[in-house]
Amino acid sequence: VSYGKIKRTPGQLTLERAKEIFEGVQPEAVKIGLTIAEDIEEITENLKEVLPDVLHLSGNIEGISPEQVRELKNRFPGLKIMQAIPVLQNVPLEEQKALEYVKQYEAVSDFFLIDTKADTANDIGATGLTHDRSIDRAIIESTSVPCIIAGGLDASNVAKAIAETRPYGVDSFSLTNFDHVEEGKSCKDPEKVKAFIEASLSA
């Protein structure tokens, strides 16, 4: 759930709506909050209002240092961090900073979410674009932090991606939404989600 006091993306929810959603799910459900904010004071204020189990940091990775991530964890004991790791399309691994980021952030991250980063965007993910899965595999093999793969995944390709990378988990945003929704918003298509889960479990 993406939420915050300052509206940063079209689909971001208000603090009030995020709180309603978190309070409405089953007790055993893991509540994940997402932010692209790069100011830990802004993030802190949001977390004081609505505290998830896991915070997905999906903004410009260089906008929040590992030391600042550690400070967030110190302020909210028990909060787990899922750090997005950006992967560029059509760029060889040796020309990317993904492995460097992994080494920098693994001491303060509970999970990595490996996702496609568009050339024109500061934040990571929500592109619907895939990338070279051998890069995912290299990242996964380089760290003990559980890695979730993302980027252009749907029911048609997720099993192959799992077979190629053996990740901790998989994530889909763009390609499991309805095809036609109001501009700037997204809405999950239950049939696409069901197919995605079934394909994932079959891998």
Predicted regions mapped to residue ranges:
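A C-terminal functional module that forms or caps the active site or interfaces directly
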Residues: I148-A163, N177-H180
